[in-house]
Amino acid sequence: MGKLARKVAMIGAGMCKFGRNFPLKRNPDMWVEAWIDAVNKVDNGIEPKDIDACYVGNYSSDLFNHQGHLGPQMANLVGLTPKPAPRFEGACASSGVALRQAIIAVASGIHDIIAVSGVECMTQLPTTGVTDTLATASDDLFEYPAGATFPGLYAAIASAHFHKYGTTAEDLMRVGIKNHENGKENPFAQMQQSIPEIMASKVKRYEQQGRDVPDWKDEIDFLKSSANPMIASPLRLFDCSLVTDGAACIFIAAGDVAKKYTDTPIWIAGTGQGSASLSLHDRDEITGFIATREAAKQAYQMSGLGPKDIQIAEVHDCFTIAEILAQEDLGFYQKGKAVEAIKNGESHRNGSLPINTSGGLKSKGHPVGATGAAMAVEIFKQMRGIAERNRQVKFDVERALTHNLGGSGGTCVVTVYQK
């Protein structure tokens, strides 16, 4: 894996509030909000005339919103037409792919500054429609005709990990508890409640309805109860990410140009992308993702860094088991050992390797086409020391990583950042 031909930096990043925003807000509205937020994060200001292209990451506005050809639409809204405005699709890794392609384009010298857009409006469809649309990112020859859904596929992955490494349902629950605690501190998150707060709200509602009030001993007891129904064994409701509308915006600039816009650019140290068979049955094993390992290998080689150098990471927790697999595939922990990071607090906000300080997909939300870009927004904030509320980590972040996975691991993008 070669080096970037010239230095590339992130000079601004922003997002809209994630949530069930439709019908009050659609893709155009959310993208403009994210754009404005990102512009406001560029220290010395930036204007459309400064930007050479708009790279749009979007999974399936065609099916969610009956709107294709999204690139020019997003570019036109912020004054970037007639400049290039391609759209990139990689399932849930769509804006991760767009970000990586923008990095490569700037490094090549073709462009000096690119605006990266990640956007998805999912709640225009009912739950059944969302499930069916997401299923188009799985294998259509074998999995889809058999009735496979992503909860079912990740349940199979979780079951395999349980069997091989002794991982338990409680281990997954601890991932969700941690990420809800982080999401509580993120004003842009869809679900800004910790698990204890969710428990308290349910108790209050039961009392108002005159129902028997459950006597949950703690968060784990609550998550084992009928209040957290089984979706696809062993995955329960709170193991699954949210159905979300949202948008995020990143400004990527060449190194010699970046200093015009900020004195504190966040440098792109390395980036990589991997792939795998869409169908689980075609893979050698399913207790990890080969696409993640390949993308990480490329990003580490390009950056000259390794897993031990990373201080903070945003990883793709579309299901709680996915966060555990990501930590192992990225080399942070040996196979079967990542659950210890949850138990002993290493991956908590004040731990030695904070994971998903944004709340992750579990709490921040998962508007699939915007997820990868939103991860970069969180890293930008943490490295700048501007994360809101009580979410800012207690140390100066010099090196960070984002991990954006598509589907059941068919696509992965890993990017490493450095001050």
Language-model features: locations:
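A short beta-alpha structural unit
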Residues: 55-60, 271-274, 311-320, 361
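Short catalytic helix/loop segments, enriched in acidic residues and glycine
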Residues: 22-42, 74, 78-79
